[in-house]
């Protein structure tokens, strides 16, 4: 099963912290949602990513960054 997620980033004193992620029905929906999140204060950026896995056994592959908007942490590098 593939999950698509949009997740914003919020500035904190010690850097950026992830905000509340939103599961989306498709890759395009996740990208559009991330773009919208990146423009909504207090967010300074957002990413859209996908993750493949089996929730019944709790096994998931690493996330694949689909698109990044605005400011995101270096460890969420895109491109």
Stretches with model-predicted labels:
Residues 1-4, 26-27, 44, 78:
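Unusually extended, aromatic-enriched hydrophobic runs near protein termini
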Residues 8-9, 33-36, 52-53:
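Intrinsically disordered, low-complexity boundary segments flanking structured domains
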Residues 24-45:
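A short, charged, amphipathic alpha-helix used as a generic interaction element across diverse proteins
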Residues 1-19:
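Short aromatic-glycine-(Arg/Gly/Cys) micro-motifs in beta-strand/loop hairpins
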Residues 12, 19, 27, 63, ...:
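Surface-exposed loop/turn and secondary-structure junction residues enriched for glycine/proline
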Residues 38-79:
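Short, mixed-charge low-complexity intrinsically disordered segments
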Residues 14-20, 32-37, 74:
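A generic short-segment signal for beta-strand/edge and adjacent turn/coil regions
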């Amino acid at each position: 099963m593939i999950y698509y997620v949009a997740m914003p980033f919020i500035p904190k004193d010690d850097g950026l912290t992830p905000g509340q992620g939103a599961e989306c029905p498709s890759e395009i929906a996740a990208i559009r949602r991330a773009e919208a999140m990146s423009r909504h204060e207090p967010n300074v950026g957002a990413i859209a990513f996908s993750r493949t896995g089996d929730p019944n056994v709790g096994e998931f592959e690493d996330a694949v960054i689909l698109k990044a908007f605005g400011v995101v942490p270096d460890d969420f590098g895109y491109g």
